[in-house]
A protein has these predicted regions:
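Carbohydrate-associated surface elements
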Residues: 114, 138
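Short hydrophobic beta-strand element within catalytic cores of glycosyltransferases
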Residues: 280-283, 293-294, 300-303
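N-terminal strand-loop element at the rim of the active site
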Residues: 1-41, 48, 132, 215
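Aromatic "clamp/platform" in nucleotide-sugar-dependent glycosyltransferases that forms part
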Residues: 263
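Conserved donor-binding/catalytic core segment of Leloir-type glycosyltransferases
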Residues: 163-181, 187-190, 207
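Nucleotide-activated donor-binding/catalytic signature segment of Leloir-type glycosyltransferases, i.e.
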Residues: 76, 218-246
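A short helix/loop element that forms part of the nucleotide-sugar donor recognition site in Leloir-type
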Residues: 145-164
Length: 336
């Protein structure tokens, strides 16, 4: 695997994770090597790896624009091994400008049902020459799982956020502070919710925001909170310290619900984490978040996007899993 970073400190030093991988998944014969590199690699490095490691295929992950250098030599590579691409696309309209990228691959694996449909829409007649599959995002159920309410370590963790013991309802936001996550909308929704409650009820509610308070890719969240809650009665807790996976599992188990109102979302990992811990969620109906709501069509089957109904954001179907509270958009906008 090419282990890329902007300026990787270990460039040139191969890291062998085979033993750790064997232990993690209880096998004996894995071969997992990391080749640290700057950026996303280059033609010279890929040619060297094909010659040295003799892989059966190349698997790409992330936005195609980071691999333009690879797509420029796809004819050279595909005479030796296939190029496969585990890909995601946030939302409609279908990115027709990606057609040449998709066509440079032998197999496309869509992380969401919408992505698989978008791959097919963009390729058109060329789709018959490709392998296109839906491979939903997954997480390790040994890392995120439901805990009993009387779990000692969980209750010890709860005391960090509920030190006076009077909180009866906690809503969790866990994601990056970036524009498309619509965090100010989440804070405004929290205000509208609190406005429906009495003073005594408000004091029993809490919004935990596990994110960076200020980010150049997002906004100044403390400023938003001060603007919407000049009386400082918001009951919002900012959690910006890095937590271990075990602590994150505690956080999801502590919450009564999770909220994610992204305007565009390829998948929405915080929803998957909430599902594994048995925590219901509120989410915008867009992208891969729809998969996790499990909408049902008129035939009683799990909704699968088509060119005619490429997304359920227009409220074509309303029946979904009992764990989800869908938020259907009231308006559409082009961003870009």
């Amino acid at each position: 695997q090419l282990a890329g970073a902007i300026k990787h400190p270990d460039t040139g030093r191969i890291q062998d994770l085979s033993e750790a991988t064997n232990k993690e998944i209880d096998i004996t014969d894995s071969s997992v090597l990391l080749y640290p590199c700057d950026g996303y690699g280059d033609e010279k490095l890929v040619r060297m790896l094909i010659e040295k490691e003799k892989p059966d295929a190349i698997l790409l992950i992330t936005d195609p624009r980071y691999f333009e250098w690879l797509f420029n030599i796809e004819d050279e590579i595909r005479t030796q091994i296939p190029i496969t691409y585990l890909n995601i696309w946030d939302d409609l309209p279908a990115p027709m400008y990606n057609q040449e990228f998709y066509d440079s691959c032998d197999a496309l694996f869509g992380i969401s049902k919408q992505t698989k449909n978008i791959n097919e829409m963009v390729l058109g007649d060329k789709v018959k020459n490709k392998v296109i599959k839906y491979i939903p995002h997954g997480l390790n159920h040994k890392k995120f799982f439901q805990l009993e309410n009387n779990d000692k370590e969980l209750n010890k963790f709860k005391s960090q956020f509920n030190n006076n013991g009077n909180k009866e309802f906690t809503l969790l936001f866990n994601s990056r502070n970036i524009r498309r996550k619509s965090i100010p909308d989440t804070i405004l929704a929290w205000k509208y919710f609190l406005d429906t409650l009495s003073k005594e009820e408000r004091e029993k509610c809490q919004l935990v925001m596990h994110t960076q308070p200020i980010d150049q890719n997002g906004t100044d969240l403390p400023a938003v909170i001060r603007f919407l809650f000049p009386e400082d009665d918001h009951n919002i807790v900012m959690s910006h310290q890095k937590l271990t996976i075990e602590q994150m599992n505690f956080l999801y188990n502590y919450a009564d619900g999770v909220i994610l109102l992204s305007s565009a979302e390829g998948w929405g990992l915080s929803l998957t984490e909430s599902l594994l811990t048995g925590t219901p969620f509120i989410a915008n109906v867009t992208g891969g978040m729809q998969d996790q709501m499990r909408f049902v069509d008129e035939k009683g089957k799990w909704f699968t996007p088509t060119p005619d109904v490429p997304s359920n954001h227009k409220k074509t179907y309303t029946e979904c899993g009992e764990w989800a509270l869908p938020v259907f958009p009231t308006n559409l906008s082009l961003v870009g």
